[in-house]
Structure formats: C-alpha cells, structure tokens
Amino acid sequence: MYEVGMREMPERSLLCLKRNVDDQGQWAFGKEFIAILRERPLPKIEGRAGAAFCIYWSHPSADSDGLIEWCKPVPAGEAHTLAEHYPELTLRTEPAHQEAFVALPAGYQAVQWDLACGSLDAWVQEEEQEHEGERLALTPEDLGLRTTYLATGPSDVAIDLAIPFAV
C-alpha cells in the first residue's frame, strides 16, 4: 500500500477532450490529445496545478466503454481567447477542491498502479467511516479518478492518482 497525501487544488480553467472509449482505444485517445497540444502548444502553468491530467469518469474494460476526459489547465485570463484556437476542445472551469493522492515514480508498473488505486480506495473507506452521515462534498463520482502526468526528466514522466473531495 502507498501513503495517501492531501493537497489543495485551485480553481482552474481547463481545455478538455472527453470521449467514451474502449480498453484498447484509451491509449489512442491520450495520444490524440497530446498530439493536439504538441501541434499547438498552450501557455505553461508551473507545478501540478498546471500539469495535463486525465479523468476516468468510468473505467474502460474489455467488456465496456469508459468515459475519459483529458484536460490541460490554461491561464484564466487567456482561457476564452485560447479556446477559440482549439475548436475540438471544450473550455470549462473546475472549482477549487482538495484531493487525496498517491504519487508513483517514473517507470511505474501496472502492479504499482493497482496498489495506488487500492490505497485510495482504503482512504475513501476510512473517510466515509470517520464522517458517517455526512457526504464528502466532492466524490469520485463528482470529479472522477484523476491521473496527473509530470515530467521528471527529458524522457521520464511520473504520475499521481488523485480523488477530489471536500468534507
């Protein structure tokens, strides 16, 4: 199991591409989004708050499609102007929130991904018991499981998995 950390995420303007994809199609979908950003780069926002991320609203499998959304934060003051240059992307504002997260190193393996998801699931169960009778204001169903991609070197990318929430 992994240690679950907590962090505050600010309100962000996001340019997004959202689609139902099957298990095999999720990689092609991610490559499509990355190709758009490489072809027409967006202004950089430093740190995790500015990193591209993927939201799994539901998980694709061999048996069914899942709803996935790729997002790139953009400067709020430039968001509407930038959106005009990306007609295939949708502009939306994400509210400020807290996230429970697990960080994985560059070169992570599938087993580490599974352990990280298990750690987040265990955290959610503990929070639900601690706050019995209350509703976590933002749940995975509200904002999905997020995967944030962070460059750690010229060819290395570390990721973290996060669940948004607020008590």
Annotate each PLM feature.
Residues 1-167:
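A solvent-exposed interaction/effector surface
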